[in-house]
Amino acid sequence: MAVNLTEKTAEQLPDIDGIALYTAQAGVKKPGHTDLTLIAVAAGSTVGAVFTTNRFCAAPVHIAKSHLFDEDGVRALVINTGNANAGTGAQGRIDALAVCAAAARQIGCKPNQVLPFSTGVILEPLPADKIIAALPKMQPAFWNEAARAIMTTDTVPKAASREGKVGDKHTVRATGIAKGSGMIHPNMATMLGFIATDAKVSQPVLQLMTQEIADETFNTITVDGDTSTNDSFVIIATGKNSQSEIDNIADPRYAQLKELLCSLALELAQAIVRDGEGATKFITVRVENAKTRDEARQAAYAVARSPLVKTAFFASDPNLGRLLAAIGYAGVADLDTDLVEMYLDDILVAEHGGRAASYTEAQGQAVMSKAEITVRIKLHRGQAAATVYTCDLSHGYVSINADYRS
């Protein structure tokens, strides 16, 4: 049950010049499901990417990392669902390379110009033969179809677009898709995200921008505290809008383009939380007046990933001592609890180390019954702030994950 999230139509997701999309049914996920996607990238495009921090990262992550900075440039991304190709050892890498070679033959490039991505069950061999057999059968697709093809336990395809001025003369377009519903936690999580723009950006600058955007968007979400083996976020810049290249972060267009792409990426990241496994509520946790952003994030994550907090939200139960407890164990050094203020939406709940005199249980109940809730925490020890996004923890989460392989 997604929280205020609906599927985008093809008309809402404009094509990006220099990008071609293809999908097919490879039979990796389940019979009758479209589970293979190819994103063909025009020659001369640049690509930035960031990947999971999980030490058991999947075979395609290893291969994509090694191909990303190849001097020949990236010409294609190939994505399968239904199998993560993680925990598959040397054979997993052989299989990922075989898929790259087959995709390269299909579009006429070198295997090292293909980035592979997989998502699905871990510790199962990749049926590379099925993927290779399906590649010649791929059909042209729209962005909304590609968004559906990369889903696993998602209930709604996730896609978004932006258009805006970058520089004085040029309008930039960007469209992106993402997947993810469970095993979601900062530092990328099983989440895949792909954004394409017609802006022209040098590879080193695009790589830095990709890292910054990931940190400000996908690394601010948590569903269940688990970090996947396959997380990947990619930005493709085709350079087809005739603007001159952005090759320096001091270029004013860098900040303009980053703001546009950050807005798109944040919509995709929030969509993952809204479609969190079993989610019935979307929760924003904002910590203000911290000494540093890291400290603010530390406190926000403690609240956002607490099972006790998340189940209280599911039950619409204003058992708000759970939130105070999470702030207390967040590890904020020398925290003066007498200075902390906590709000549910605009309702002051706690101050001076205890319950606010003005707060009533009825007020808390009214807020906790909403589908979207904001928790605001003021530490009163500095000027830094951070926001993270999470969802509640329901019976549905347990059922989805208990039945995942059945």
Swiss-Prot record:
Keywords: Acyltransferase, Amino-acid biosynthesis, Arginine biosynthesis, Autocatalytic cleavage, Cytoplasm, Multifunctional enzyme, Transferase
Homology family: Belongs to the ArgJ family.
Cellular localisation: Cytoplasm
MF GO annotations: glutamate N-acetyltransferase activity; L-glutamate N-acetyltransferase activity
CDD domains tied to this protein: OAT
Binding site for substrate: 152, 179, 190, 277, 401, 406
Xref: Gene3D superfamilies: ArgJ beta chain, C-terminal domain, L-amino peptidase D-ALA esterase/amidase
EC code: 2.3.1.35, 2.3.1.1
Lineage summary: Bacteria, Pseudomonadati, Pseudomonadota, Betaproteobacteria, Neisseriales
Name used for this protein in its record: Arginine biosynthesis bifunctional protein ArgJ
